[in-house]
Amino acid sequence: MVEADHPGKLFIGGLNRETNEKMLKAVFGKHGPISEVLLIKDRTSKSRGFAFITFENPADAKNAAKDMNGKSLHGKAIKVEQAKKPSFQSGGRRRPPASSRNRSPSGSLRSARGSRGGTRGWLPSQEGHLDDGGYTPDLKMSYSRGLIPVKRGPSSRSGGPPPKKSAPSAVARSNSWMGSQGPMSQRRENYGVPPRRATISSWRNDRMSTRHDGYATNDGNHPSCQETRDYAPPSRGYAYRDNGHSNRDEHSSRGYRNHRSSRETRDYAPPSRGHAYRDYGHSRRDESYSRGYRNRRSSRETREYAPPSRGHGYRDYGHSRRHESYSRGYRNHPSSRETRDYAPPHRDYAYRDYGHSSWDEHSSRGYSYHDGYGEALGRDHSEHLSGSSYRDALQRYGTAHGAPPARGPRMSYGGSTCHAYSNTRDRYGRSWESYSSCGDFHYCDREHVCRKDQRNPPSLGRVLPDPREACGSSSYVASIVDGGESRSEKGDSSRY
């Protein structure tokens, strides 16, 4: 049974678009006093063709409906009927008018139709309409719309396809993101160290002296034993030369990244022809020089710098040493051989520098900046001396170090004071004099090597190089025998 919304409320539909509230009030006011006229308009403020009129007296409303229904108003036939509440019956599936937001005459009209079609219920005006309290068929539409979400809602709540799809996609996205992040992070890790290393190595290489053209060995790596060995002079019966001391050298090199391996020092050993020291010392110097920066040059590199002169083996020696010690001034300690090399080896003394290599290297550990006495010598010779000038300098060194005698007692290269070397009579002569008051050296200081004073020459089995010669800070004396005179020269090796 249809329920009226408001007894005095009428729905007027089919109005002309040009009809306004004043016209409606003038026409319907004849039937009785009107409390409200509501013309439904669109957003552009144009009439949508229907309106609601409320009479103060319900009887007047009934009379107006009977009188005005089906009549023409402004050229169009209008429909007037009692406004009714919209029905909630599911059977009535009439499509409400597009204007469902506000109370609309079409709503009441359709409601009336619904009532004729057998619809049983109406929505209360409070529920179905806005402020005006009139009916609107739109409520049914809104209700149907509500049903649609209700139907869809359960599927979504129950985890329908859309949620499922979205969830996997999210998971996939997260997985892909994680995957991409993982590789990216790995890439970052892999590429971090090499550049640094590259920069560090390049820095080291740059700091290396220009004398050595990129012969530096691996950074922080000691040259392989084979590498140093390859350069060792062929032994002619001096089998023991480096063998005995090589171990020490190697140990010392192990202790410090900067120390060369024993073999490396070995490589610089002179070829035992009597002039081995020359090349040997020289190459040593260069090597230690290059090594001054954790980069160590191959023995070959140092070797290339060795002067080939046979007669002045010692000179070249000291000279090369100096350079080497210079290079080592940076963190590199001259190998024991390095310092040793500066001593003039005698032809007969196979052990010549080989024995000393280990000691020199140990001494090099004690102090980083001072290479063998050769550093001072090498510097003086390399920078200031050439040809015969070497001899002079070496002779001067001889006074401090003493000339290397041929077969006599071997000269000890140790000595707290480099000036203690006075006896240099035989140069290549028959007896070796102790170069320094200290044959055995102890390295206490980077700058200064503490040694025990040994005035006596070391036994043939072992000759200990003067750590001061190897690392002496204040002066280096190289003994060189040339023409029967011993020459000594003081060099300041503590420049670094």
From Swiss-Prot:
Tell me where in or outside the cell this protein is found.
Nucleus
UniProtKB keywords: mRNA processing, mRNA splicing, Nucleus, RNA-binding
Q: Where is the RRM domain?
A: 8-85
The UniProt annotation puts the region (Disordered) at 67-348, 453-496
Q: Name one Pfam family in it.
A: RRM_1
GO MF annotations, alphabetized: RNA binding
Q: Where is the composition biased (Polar residues)?
A: 175-184
Biased composition of type Low complexity is found at 97-114, 149-159
Fetch the SMART domains from UniProt: RRM (SM00360)
Mind telling me which GO cellular component terms the entry cites?
Answer: nucleolus; nucleoplasm; spliceosomal complex
Q: Where is the composition biased (Basic and acidic residues)?
A: 204-214, 242-253, 276-289, 313-326, 335-348, 484-496
Tissue specificity, in the record's words, reads: Testis-specific.
What InterPro entries does this protein map onto? Nucleotide-bd_a/b_plait_sf, RBD_domain_sf, RBM, RBM1CTR, RRM_dom
Instruction: Give one GO biological process term.
Output: positive regulation of mRNA splicing, via spliceosome
Superkingdom to which the source organism belongs:
Eukaryota
Q: How does it assemble?
A: Interacts with splicing factor proteins SFRS3/SRP20, TRA2B/SFRS10, KHDRBS1/SAM68 and KHDRBS3.
What does the function comment of this entry state? RNA-binding protein which may be involved in spermatogenesis. Required for sperm development, possibly by participating in pre-mRNA splicing in the testis.
Additional comment: The RBMY1 proteins are encoded by repeated regions of the Y chromosome, mostly within the AZFb region. The exact number of functional copies is unclear and may vary between individuals, and some of them may represent pseudogenes. The proteins are very similar, which makes the characterization of each protein difficult. Thus, most experiments do not discriminate between the different members. One can therefore suppose that reported interactions with a RBMY1 protein involve all the proteins.
| Protein name per UniProt | RNA-binding motif protein, Y chromosome, family 1 member E
Its gene?
Answer: RBMY1E
